[in-house]
Each structure stands twice: as C-alpha cells, then as structure tokens.
Amino acid sequence: MLARIGWITSFLGVPCNGPNHWPDLGRRPSVRHPVSESSAGTSPDLNVLGQPLVVCGCQPMTGWFRDGHCRTNAADLGRHSVCCVVTEAFLRYSQAQGNDLSTPAPAYGFPGLRPGDHWCVCAPRWLEAYEDGMAPPVRLEATEDSALEVIPLALLQANAA
C-alpha cells in the first residue's frame, strides 16, 4: 500500500488533503495530462487573490491534472480554472448545455457530481452560466489566476462561496 501511495504522491506532486480528501489512495487517476511548467515547480501556482493556489476538491478528484487543483496549461482548451461549489441548478444547467456532470461515467473513473461537490469548471462556461443566472459559488482561494483572463475579479468576488 505504501508503494501505491508513493506513486500517487509522486504523480500528483502532493497528496490531496483538501476539504474533500480522496480516500481511495490505491486507485490511480484515470486521466494523465502533460505537466505544466508551474506544476513542475518552476513557478508557484497563484489564485485570483495573488496568493498560493489551494486544493479545490478531491472527492471526487477534480482539476485538469486530476490533482485536486484548478490549474491549467496550454493543452487545457477548456481552461478548467474556476473552483466551484456545484449546485443542483448549475448541474441541471450544465446538462442542458450538453455537459452532463451528474451522471457517473465509471469507464473514466467519474462518479458524477452532487450538489455541494467542489469542481474545477471551465472559465468560459462559468461566465456563460453567470450571464444566464446559473453560476455556482466560487472558492476564490482555489481559483487559478488565469481565470481572470476570462472573468473579471469583481464577478468572482460577488459570487464567492
């Protein structure tokens, strides 16, 4: 078991010990993505407040890198940078837009989201949901500063969890 924990710790960079800790440390993440420069330790990941980025959620595991953080790189075309506390209304809205986040997809290790789960949402999708009155609350400390390229800070602050 310790070898498997070590593998995950080295794969993810740090153990996920955020508010929704991933309890099944023996299960490997189902998706691998190239490591960004910032995730390789050459520069710190910052949140929209200019502070170090904190874990968004690990139950279920979230983030482009599936390490619990809402951080991105050039390969993430969706820009999964906004840490949200998903609501029933947002899950219904997302499904109506063609992105069903509530239905489990076991083939991808995805359990489906429930209201209250913390999830990294694409910045353009969050802005679209905001414009339609359906944006979920945002955890500013866990939202990557790159989200500011799409969403004004004032909107994020007005919708802070």
What is the predicted role of each segment?
Residues 36-89, 158:
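Extended boundary segments
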Residues 85-100:
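Short, basic/aromatic beta-hairpin or loop at an interaction surface
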Residues 102-109:
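Short alpha-helix capping/helix-loop boundary micro-motifs
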Residues 126-149:
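Short, compositionally biased
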Residues 146-161:
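Glycine- and charge-enriched low-complexity intrinsically disordered segments
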